[in-house]
Amino acid sequence: MTLLKDGFFDPEELKILPGVPSEERLKKGPVVVIECAQEIPCDPCESACHKRAIEIGDSIINLPKLNADLCSGCGLCIAACPGQAIFVVDMNYTETEATVQFPYEFLPRPKEGDIADGLNRAGEKVCDAKVLKVIIPKKFDRTAVITVSVPKEFGMEVRNIANRLKNE
């Protein structure tokens, strides 16, 4: 598994994870993507989901399983994950764009309307990403949830952004 060797998933490896929705479900609208492959004692995502779309099961070290049909894409589970392994992807944002929501703990935080570098799992720039929303509720313990729009072909690839420094 490339996660252990390189620190990030190969896109093909994601298909075997129980928290990744099918391509058919991705086409229906916003849905959670859980990129968790570590069997460690952890279950905040399960309790954060009011729809019961995420299940850990009897053993707290089980990988989270997604029932994508129950998921509304609300994103309450994103900041609940201490491993920052949960995202919400909407492949139907527009005809040509998808949105990606992800946890963000860097400063300075981007602002709505900013154009940032859309980064893949390896931290490489793959596209421009427009910041649509920045949410920082107190219950998220200072973890912001950022929503960006990206070209549709990068919806399942972009997992973070890099702010572009502006010359002032």
Predicted regions and their residues:
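Intrinsically disordered, low-complexity, charged/polar segments
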Residues: N160-E168
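Short, solvent-exposed secondary-structure boundary/capping segments
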Residues: I136-V150
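Short beta-strand-centered aromatic/proline hotspots
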Residues: E124-K138
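Local cysteine-cluster metal-coordination motifs and their immediate loop/turn environment
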Residues: I40-R52, D69-Q84
